[in-house]
Structure formats: structure tokens, C-alpha cells
UniProtKB/Swiss-Prot annotation:
EC number(s) given by UniProt: 7.1.1.6
Species in which this protein is naturally found: Nostoc punctiforme (strain ATCC 29133 / PCC 73102)
Intrachain S-S bonds: C113-C128
Thylakoid in keyword set: yes
Cofactor detail note: Binds 1 [2Fe-2S] cluster per subunit.
Topology of the protein relative to the lipid bilayer: Single-pass membrane protein
Primary enzyme class: translocase
Protein known as: Cytochrome b6-f complex iron-sulfur subunit
Compartments where found: Cellular thylakoid membrane
CDD domains: Rieske_cytochrome_b6f
PROSITE patterns documented for this protein: RIESKE
Example of a GO MF term: electron transporter, transferring electrons within cytochrome b6/f complex of photosystem II activity
Length: 179
């Protein structure tokens, strides 16, 4: 009678173990593939551009050219662009040839609504709960507890570049609460 002996040629994994391993690998791969966009959603956009800043984007996601931006705008105009961390940011027109050296984050410090610029009253007015900010974004009427955040605006290769504001807030004389 012939006896079977274990040899190196005989695999030690049975059919059931192989199918379990194959199923586990497939399910794990699909789960990781499905989780990737979910995890990516919670990671803020990387900053790039000149000096660690973010190039301002228009409503279509294109880089904002300073010359085109200033073509149809007057001194004192405030126009929204996509700024640091993807937040809506107002670029302030200084003259027909230049923009101010700061941008104003349009997110209300009360509950996070986007605050529109009211040209008739020369101030920002939050539509959600009535907070009001002056032309520089300083809070003048609550319930918002703080002024709107600032960002530096620079021009590099005809593009508007926003960088974080870390110096003293010129409106209040205090350290910036947002940095």
C-alpha cells in the first residue's frame, strides 16, 4: 500500500482557504478604493504658487489675471475669488491699475455664511443673521464676534497670489485670530 508523504510540491492551502483569501483581498481592495475619495475630501487643498501662496481662481476655477481683473472694475470694488483653502475671498480694487495688498475672507465669523458686499451701504452684510462689517471687513454689528479674516494679495506673473496674513490685524491692532 502506498503512503502519501508531505512534500514541498504539495501546497498547504486548501480550496476553501484560497477562496476565503481571494474574497478577503477583493473586498479589501474595493473598500479601500471607495474610502480614498472620502478621506481625500477631508484633506484641505495644498497651497502652491509663489512663496507658498495660493493663486486666486475665478468661478470657473481658472487663474485670475490681474490685467483682465482690473479691466472692468473701479477703485473700491470688491470681487469674489477662490482664495486660501478654497474659501471665497474679496479682492479689493485700489485703482484702475492696482489691487489692495490685502484680501478679505468672505466667511462670516458667526456661523460661516458667505457675506456679500453691499455697494449701496458700503459695507458687508451677512444675510443669515444680520452681522455687518465695514469696508475693510472689521465687524461693526453682531452677532458676529470677530472681524473677517485677511490674506495678503501679491501679483506674480500677472496672477493674483494670496498668502496667509500672520502680522497684526491693521483694523484692530490685535494678533490675527485666524492664524
Amino acid at each position: 500500500m502506498a503512503q502519501f508523504s508531505e512534500s514541498a510540491d504539495v501546497p498547504d492551502m486548501g480550496r476553501r482557504q484560497f477562496m476565503n483569501l481571494l474574497t478577503f483581498g477583493t473586498v479589501t481592495g474595493v473598500a479601500l478604493g471607495a474610502l480614498y475619495p472620502v478621506v481625500n475630501y477631508f484633506i484641505p487643498p495644498a497651497t502652491g504658487g509663489a512663496g507658498g501662496g495660493t493663486t486666486a481662481k475665478d468661478e470657473l476655477g481658472n487663474d485670475v489675471s490681474v490685467t483682465k481683473f482690473l479691466e472692468n472694475r473701479n477703485a473700491g470694488d470688491r470681487n469674489l475669488v477662490q482664495g486660501l483653502k478654497g474659501d471665497p475671498t474679496y479682492i479689493v480694487v485700489d485703482s484702475k491699475e492696482a489691487i489692495k495688498d490685502y484680501g478679505i475672507n468672505a466667511i462670516c465669523t458667526h456661523l460661516g455664511c458667505v457675506v456679500p458686499w453691499n455697494v449701496a451701504e458700503n459695507k458687508f452684510k451677512c444675510p443669515c443673521h444680520g452681522s455687518q462689517y465695514d469696508e475693510t471687513g472689521k465687524v461693526v454689528r453682531g452677532p458676529a464676534p470677530l472681524s473677517l479674516a485677511l490674506a495678503h494679495t501679491n501679483v506674480s506673473d500677472d496672477k493674483i497670489v494670496l498668502t496667509p496674513w500672520t502680522e497684526t490685524d491693521f483694523r484692530t491692532g490685535d494678533a490675527p485670530w485666524w492664524s
